[in-house]
């Protein structure tokens, strides 16, 4: 296949919702990997959790990466669009609350609850919301590509995931240097807010064959 033929396939071989979903994924990955790049240092030095910071950051990632199989049940029930909006809404609140822990405005709340308890609660909230993203976007890619274009579709998806993973920490470094480490989390929260709006305006529930509905009983 020539470069011109490949470009033509990329340009015409996918439904609009495919590109919307992948654009949402790109910016979600920018927000996630940006916050992940500073999370342990932020919790240790800015919030003051010291040696507990690594444990909490590790637990956050473990929960985030282990829940999508269960989150798929929710996505099956409520659809991609509503699940994406819920995901970004939880991310928006979660990143904001994590960032609040390192700001003067949040000190009274964290001191009242206890820093560790507060951070653990908001990290788990954020992880639960984040678990919804992968079933939504992967499912959308599967439903908006044909058998012929599916391999290319997933290649584009993983390329954008990797691109977000590469650029996110670089942007986080600039925000940290210019504004402060806590504002990396606030920028991730703002990005998530914009993703809610983008999903509401541009994302359309993809058609395609309806598979067997999953339930929690079937998953476990």
Residue ranges and their predicted role:
Residues 64, 151-176, 191-192:
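Glycine-rich segments within core transmembrane alpha-helices of 12-TM secondary carriers
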Residues 182-201:
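Symmetry-related core transmembrane helices of the 12-TM Major Facilitator Superfamily/SLC fold
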Residues 89-114:
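C-terminal ends and interior cores of transmembrane alpha-helices
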Residues 132-146:
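Intracellular juxtamembrane helix-capping segments at the cytosolic ends
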Residues 58-73:
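Central cavity-lining transmembrane alpha-helices of secondary-active solute carriers
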Residues 37-53:
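Short amphipathic helix-loop junctions that connect adjacent transmembrane helices
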Residues 29, 33, 127-135, 166:
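Small-residue-rich segments within alpha-helical transmembrane domains of MFS-like 12-TM solute carriers
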